[in-house]
């Protein structure tokens, strides 16, 4: 997962199921869009607002016409459904992504280095 650069995006990801989609990076999947079209390709990136960048895409419009695209950017507002590939362990993927976020948040571990959210001093 290419980590979000802002604290806000990491917080949104951590507190929603978007973290599951971020864990699908590199997987080939199908994204159903609100206009009844379908895009199938490899997930390159998913941000905290569910914007999805796909590569090697087969785009099928609502009338069944197919177009091959090198890449496609889908805004989160236009996503209806993302198909989770059968081989993905959902629980393990979420836990792995949470560990990545927590590792970045703590900047090197407990008691080492600067913290993203400094602890309150009594």
From Swiss-Prot:
Residues 16-88 form the Sm domain. Pfam families: LSM. SMART domains: Sm (SM00651). Gene3D superfamilies: 2.30.30.100. Keywords: mRNA processing, mRNA splicing, Nucleus, Ribonucleoprotein, RNA-binding. GO terms for molecular function: histone pre-mRNA DCP binding; snRNA binding; U7 snRNA binding. It is found in: Nucleus. Its main location: nucleus. PROSITE patterns: SM. The keyword Repeat does not apply. Not methylated. Methylation is not necessary for interaction with SMN. GO terms for biological process: mRNA processing; positive regulation of G1/S transition of mitotic cell cycle; RNA splicing. GO terms for cellular component: Cajal body; U7 snRNP. Component of the heptameric ring U7 snRNP complex, or U7 Sm protein core complex, at least composed of LSM10, LSM11, SNRPB, SNRPD3, SNRPE, SNRPF, SNRPG and U7 snRNA. Formation of the U7 snRNP is an ATP-dependent process mediated by a specialized SMN complex containing at least the Sm protein core complex and additionally, the U7-specific LSM10 and LSM11 proteins. Interacts with CLNS1A and SMN. Belongs to the snRNP Sm proteins family. Appears to function in the U7 snRNP complex that is involved in histone 3'-end processing. Increases U7 snRNA levels but not histone 3'-end pre-mRNA processing activity, when overexpressed. Required for cell cycle progression from G1 to S phases. Binds specifically to U7 snRNA. Binds to the downstream cleavage product (DCP) of histone pre-mRNA. This is U7 snRNA-associated Sm-like protein LSm10. It comes from Mus musculus (Mouse).
